[in-house]
Amino acid sequence: MVALRLIPCLDVANGRVVKGVNFVNLRDSGDPVELACKYSEAGADELVFLDIRASVENRKTLVDLVSRTAKSVKIPFTVGGGINSINSINDLLRAGADKVSLNSSAVKNPDIISKSSTNFGTQCIVIAIDARKKITKYNEWEVYVKGGRENTGLDVISWAKKVEELGAGEILLTSMDGDGTQNGYDLLLTQTVANAVNIPVIASGGAGSVEDIYDVFTKGKASAALLASLLHDKKLTIDEIKSFLIEKKLPIRPN
């Protein structure tokens, strides 16, 4: 059985790790390189580094920061934010990233998914989907871009199927309603997307306890759990989470 993964997420703005609630009210959580080293040494299975301002301000992700961070860790590392060309992907992979995460650019130009997966391999291409519940529907969600500021009107499930067809290797699925709340993952959203595709789904948005993480693996059918506030706020450690999940007989890589 493939091991389930715990993935700390480093949201970066202006060179600092930040975290908010529902994509707003951002607060400083530390230096990205220091936190990357800390989580790598603590037993994280992978890391995700997202320049959350890049898409909004049309800037390239800071390649030098990526390079310094990637050189500091020995685990797989995904980079996202403002990536809108094959050249940008190439620059980031050369800077040390193992994978790139595409969001706004993939919605605007879906061909970038197929072209990048052909050029670099599907294993390098992660499609980030920021999902928000439709007010009038219990089990329907819409895709948002530009850091959660713009509603595309796209149905999340249809888009997830489309990106898989185009060559995405993974989906990074964020519940905007749960982001930063520590009230638990959106299990219905995660399970619905996981059941609709045959590629790994990384669940994001809402982790507040070890039980939440257990639930997103067992009920949500996620292949990986993204962790941010829970770790940045020192509510739990990676070791504590892994110990709990191993006791529950889940396939987790021990520290």
Curated annotation (Swiss-Prot):
- Example GO molecular function: imidazoleglycerol-phosphate synthase activity
Q: What Pfam families does the database record attribute to this sequence?
A: His_biosynth
Q: Which UniProt keywords apply?
A: Amino-acid biosynthesis, Cytoplasm, Histidine biosynthesis, Lyase
Subunit arrangement?
Heterodimer of HisH and HisF.
What is this enzyme's EC? 4.3.2.10
Q: Where in the cell is it found?
A: Cytoplasm
| Primary gene name | hisF
The reply on keyword Amino-acid biosynthesis is yes
Any GO BP annotation: L-histidine biosynthetic process
- The name on file for this protein is Imidazole glycerol phosphate synthase subunit HisF
Which reaction equation describes what this protein catalyses?
Answer: 5-[(5-phospho-1-deoxy-D-ribulos-1-ylimino)methylamino]-1-(5-phospho-beta-D-ribosyl)imidazole-4-carboxamide + L-glutamine = D-erythro-1-(imidazol-4-yl)glycerol 3-phosphate + 5-amino-1-(5-phospho-beta-D-ribosyl)imidazole-4-carboxamide + L-glutamate + H(+)
UniProt-listed NCBIfam families: hisF
Q: Name one GO cellular component term.
A: cytoplasm
Pathway assigned to this chain's UniProt record: Amino-acid biosynthesis; L-histidine biosynthesis; L-histidine from 5-phospho-alpha-D-ribose 1-diphosphate: step 5/9
The record, for Gene3D superfamilies, names:
Aldolase class I
Q: Which organism is it from?
A: Prochlorococcus marinus subsp. pastoris (strain CCMP1986 / NIES-2087 / MED4)
Q: Where is the active site?
A: D11, D130
The enzyme's first-digit EC class, named in words, is lyase
Summarizing the function annotation, the protein's role is: IGPS catalyzes the conversion of PRFAR and glutamine to IGP, AICAR and glutamate. The HisF subunit catalyzes the cyclization activity that produces IGP and AICAR from PRFAR using the ammonia provided by the HisH subunit.
Indicate the family of this protein. Answer: Belongs to the HisA/HisF family.
